[in-house]
């Protein structure tokens, strides 16, 4: 008999998501409980969902204040009694056979510590969502389709053995709205077990576009807040890289301001700004042609804005919140295997070189005028 506790922290408390989760097919000889943690005291719990709470198979916990998904998951872990814990977000629609898929994987591979599947987004509906796909910022949501194993997985769709969790919990230092806490949690488990999570490309949940696909960069700024905290917790997965577009703009515009004062002209600032921005978009366009094809390369502008918003959050955290000056050009290897660092450095170096070259070209052009 396999026992599974499904832990769902919920701020939204929407029946359209919660009910399909607790109505997933339960395989034979599998004992499943659903632990829902209501994390929004100001939101009334829907009656149609409340009628399904029996405090045996469907158990509802209510936070007295909004604590965030990470602390809410800890409530679930503290009350979990099952052999396995399945984390699901409250804004996904799981495939009907999700638990069956995980149960079969557990039976086939009882010695593995955990498994994770894909979180699938709809087809892009506008230029912004096409840019999200093009820039690869969502890679880890569907990485189970083309990776074999990984040290961590998004908590939208991952199951892990309870005995391997032990006393490990989601750290409270991470932002309430999310970012980095899932990486930290699973890396703690990896440090303890030295075993990675196995990928299941047939374990699927479906996620709608945030804000219905409307342009919004706050989420990606916020992600980097939490990610930046990982640098000091897991320094073995950090590395230095060439300045990104936001770092280059910040320091380039700062130093060019002295030339503006000296020349009594705003021209140096404009030259630096144009050189960096044009270089970034040009190289990103070329990169996308090489790896994504001409069709997706037209969304290089959109993808660059998304990545830049993420870089803004990272620079703010390093310099303002954490006051880590030496962390400015520091990056976190999210694959946690150091296999992709060389690739990242090559493209970052090409981009940084383009900033300098295009700035010089613009300067010489204006000088001739």
Labelled PLM ranges:
Residues 117-118, 132-150:
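Short, flexible, basic/aromatic active-site loop/helix in glycosyltransferases
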């Amino acid at each position: 008999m396999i026992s599974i506790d499904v832990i769902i922290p919920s701020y939204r408390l929407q029946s359209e998501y919660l009910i399909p989760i607790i109505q997933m097919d339960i395989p034979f000889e599998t004992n499943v409980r659903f632990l829902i943690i209501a994390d929004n005291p100001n939101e009334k719990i829907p009656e149609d969902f409340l009628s399904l709470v029996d405090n045996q198979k469907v158990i509802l916990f209510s936070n007295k204040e909004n604590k965030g998904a990470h602390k809410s998951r800890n409530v679930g872990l503290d009350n979990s009694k099952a052999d396995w814990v399945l984390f699901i977000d409250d804004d996904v629609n799981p495939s009907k056979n999700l638990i069956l898929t995980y149960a079969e994987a557990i039976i086939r591979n009882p010695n593995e510590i955990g498994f994770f599947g894909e979180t699938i987004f709809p087809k892009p509906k506008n230029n912004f969502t096409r840019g999200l796909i093009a820039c690869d910022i969502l890679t880890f949501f569907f990485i189970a389709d083309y990776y074999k194993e990984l040290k961590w997985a998004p908590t939208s769709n991952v199951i892990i053995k309870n005995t391997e969790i032990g006393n490990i919990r989601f750290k409270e230092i991470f932002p309430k709205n999310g970012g980095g806490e899932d990486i930290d949690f699973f890396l703690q488990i990896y440090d303890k077990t030295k075993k990675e999570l196995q990928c299941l490309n047939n374990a699927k949940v479906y996620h709608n576009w945030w804000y219905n696909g409307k342009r919004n960069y706050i989420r990606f700024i916020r992600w980097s807040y939490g990610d930046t905290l990982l640098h000091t917790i897991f320094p073995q997965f950090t590395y230095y890289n060439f300045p990104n577009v936001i770092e280059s703009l910040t320091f380039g515009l700062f130093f060019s301001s002295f030339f503006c004062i000296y020349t009594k002209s705003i021209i140096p600032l404009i030259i630096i700004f144009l050189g960096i921005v044009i270089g970034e978009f040009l190289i990103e366009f070329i990169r996308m042609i090489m790896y994504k094809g001409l069709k997706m390369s037209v969304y290089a502008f959109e993808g660059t804005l998304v990545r830049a918003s993420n870089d803004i959050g990272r620079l703010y955290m390093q310099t303002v919140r954490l006051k880590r000056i030496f962390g400015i050009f520091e990056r976190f290897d999210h694959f946690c295997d150091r296999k992709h660092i060389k690739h990242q450095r090559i493209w970052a170096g090409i981009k940084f070189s383009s900033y300098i070259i295009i700035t010089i070209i613009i300067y010489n052009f204006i000088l001739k005028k």
